[in-house]
């Protein structure tokens, strides 16, 4: 595992371990959910440090140089991309994530089933997410997303997306807490940590399971970074 972690953060730099042996185990553990379980265990390890008062959703498109599964052309990036939507707590720890989404879809594509799966997984781990603010930008502001949040006991805190609306919305004004929304910057900080892992900046993995497995390693390292730093001081 140490060799795989070093490979994804720094690239191959030493010749002591065969790259084919490292990739063999990485491929195996990506497909049998071992890396996903590693990430889940990292969440349970830091459970007492998590802050569930606010959850933050955001996404980032990754250029895919060699194509592969769930890869499609994205005009804004001017290339083939894929997307992933992690969910962080108020401190920026990654506690849930969607799977890989093709880059030709907007951020709200199939958002309802993605959120339902993420919320159910967090509840299965015993994470007390009920009552939390759910921060997301206007790209995720859909009726289904808000309804899903309410159904799972969360408070949707999204800037209103006025697309396709020709007149002012009637009825009660939507709940929106601007002070809470401003604190979602921690999600951007988390993406900066993810970008430190070279294998995630540009996608070379053709299989979704492998690219997602690389993310699980990064998520685990980010969640445990303060524990590892204290251990090796």
Describe the residue ranges of each PLM region.
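Short alpha-helical elements
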Residues: 1-233
């Amino acid at each position: 595992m140490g060799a795989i972690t070093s490979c994804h953060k720094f690239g191959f730099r030493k010749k002591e371990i065969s790259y084919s042996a490292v990739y063999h185990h990485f491929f195996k553990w990506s497909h049998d959910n071992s890396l996903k379980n590693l990430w889940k265990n990292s969440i349970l390890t830091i459970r007492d440090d998590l802050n569930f008062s606010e959850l933050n959703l955001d996404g980032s498109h990754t250029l895919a140089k060699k194509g592969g599964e769930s890869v499609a052309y994205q005009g804004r990036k001017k290339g083939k991309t894929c997307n992933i939507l992690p969910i962080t707590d108020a401190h920026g720890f990654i506690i849930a994530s969607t799977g890989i989404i093709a880059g030709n879809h907007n951020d709200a594509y199939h958002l309802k089933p993605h959120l339902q799966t993420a919320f159910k997984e967090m509840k299965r781990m015993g994470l007390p997410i009920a009552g939390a603010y759910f921060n997301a930008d206007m790209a995720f502001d859909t009726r289904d997303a808000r309804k899903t949040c309410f159904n799972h006991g969360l408070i949707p805190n999204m800037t209103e997306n006025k697309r396709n609306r020709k007149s002012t919305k009637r009825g009660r004004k939507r709940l929106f807490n601007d002070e809470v929304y401003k604190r979602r910057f921690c999600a951007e900080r988390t993406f900066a940590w993810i970008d430190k892992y070279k294998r995630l900046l540009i996608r070379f993995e053709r299989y979704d399971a492998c690219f997602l497995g690389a993310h699980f390693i990064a998520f685990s390292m980010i969640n445990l970074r303060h524990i590892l730093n204290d251990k090796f001081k």
